[in-house]
Amino acid sequence: MLDPFSEKAKELLKEFGSMNEFLQAIPSLVDIEEVMNRLKFAKESEISEDILNIEDIRDLASFYAQIGALAYSPYGLELELVKKANLRIYTERIRRRRKIRSDEIGIEVKIAVEFPENDIKTLEKVYGGLPEYIVSLREFLDLVPDEKLSSYYVYDGNVYLRKDDLLKVWSKAFERNVEKAVNIIYEIRDELPEFYRRLAGEIRSFAEKEFSDKFREVQAGELKHHLFPPCVKNALRGVPQGMRNYAITVLLTSFLSYARICPNPPRRNVKIRDCIKDMRVITEEILPIIIEAGNRCSPPLFEDQPNEIKNIWYHLGFGYTANPTLEDSGNSTWYFPPNCDKIKANAPQLCTPDKHCRYIRNPLTYYLRRLYLEEKRRAKHADEGSDKGGKERILQ
């Protein structure tokens, strides 16, 4: 198997019915030790031949076991480990394959068979031979927007690639597909067998040893408004009558509370008292933002419906009350942020997607992803600064 997101892989998965059914079957196909062995080699210089030559169905089971486990921590150390290990496996398999067919990898690729006669000599001179593959210009720019087109041969709406160039484009598609798969399974993680939760714990422990010195896990902390999804930013500006209760009580209340208190909840039925010891986190940091947004509505929500504040507490899991204590947590369900499909259905005006919304299924995972990317940039700049400082010390 060259790519778990290829058409060939999808055909194999059809034998199980749906992805959910395949996820239910995986614990009977592979065990946690086998899945972890696939990840632990990431620290080794060579990949085991047993891993490279595993049968297709076990390969898919091991890979999607990791994706299922990532649903419990979609953005963080674990994602870095899973992407790193699997990119090495599938990259090595692709390198070993003499010719790659379109149905074997997760991007639309064709074999380059025809070239303008006048360009053949130039191509052979620049590439040291004729390029082997073709990818549409549109897909190329989508996957590797920072690449300089002047470094490639472009003709008739296609980019001509050598195998190493194709691997560069494919790896970007693979990473994007991993995130897409995790976001899909995130929505059904409460239906998964206990196997995935245990595997998630094993992956977390190993990932902390592998990456903790370079990358901090996304944790509860001060809200970063500039990283909020568009739907939340729109709700914060205030909305007209007809959308107020959904935007403020349902969306903002759930999003702000989880984003501040428990951005990466281990399960859906968590209680606020499991996550904080001081109610001031809610009364001083979260509730004022909700009330301000309600006051920006037309007409102002809490002037028009003063008892709606009790409904806010109800959605936070404290029951229908105006003055709860921490001990009241659990008297009702702490509502999880609605997914993107529900927001589109109930308040379509809130949904104005930006470039970060692609493949995201829930506003909370949008926020997690933005935090994750910001942390990656911080770690990268820290490494670059460390390298620069080291060079300066050497020169001195």
UniProtKB/Swiss-Prot annotation:
GO cellular component: primosome complex
CDD domains registered for this protein in UniProt: PriL (cd06560)
Coiled-coil residue spans: none
UniProt binding sites for [4Fe-4S] cluster: 231, 340, 351, 357
Cofactor descriptive note: Binds 1 [4Fe-4S] cluster.
Biological process, per Gene Ontology: DNA replication, synthesis of primer
GO MF terms held by the record: 4 iron, 4 sulfur cluster binding; DNA-directed RNA polymerase activity; metal ion binding
Chloroplast found in the keyword field: no
Keywords recorded for this protein, A-Z: 4Fe-4S, DNA replication, Iron, Iron-sulfur, Metal-binding, Primosome
Cofactor: [4Fe-4S] cluster
NCBIfam families to which the protein is assigned, alphabetical: PRK03968.1
Family: Belongs to the eukaryotic-type primase large subunit family.
Subunit text: Heterodimer of a small subunit (PriS) and a large subunit (PriL). Both participate in formation of the active center, but the ATP-binding site is exclusively located on the small subunit.
Chain's role: Regulatory subunit of DNA primase, an RNA polymerase that catalyzes the synthesis of short RNA molecules used as primers for DNA polymerase during DNA replication. Stabilizes and modulates the activity of the small subunit, increasing the rate of DNA synthesis, and conferring RNA synthesis capability. The DNA polymerase activity may enable DNA primase to also catalyze primer extension after primer synthesis. May also play a role in DNA repair.
Entry protein name: DNA primase large subunit PriL
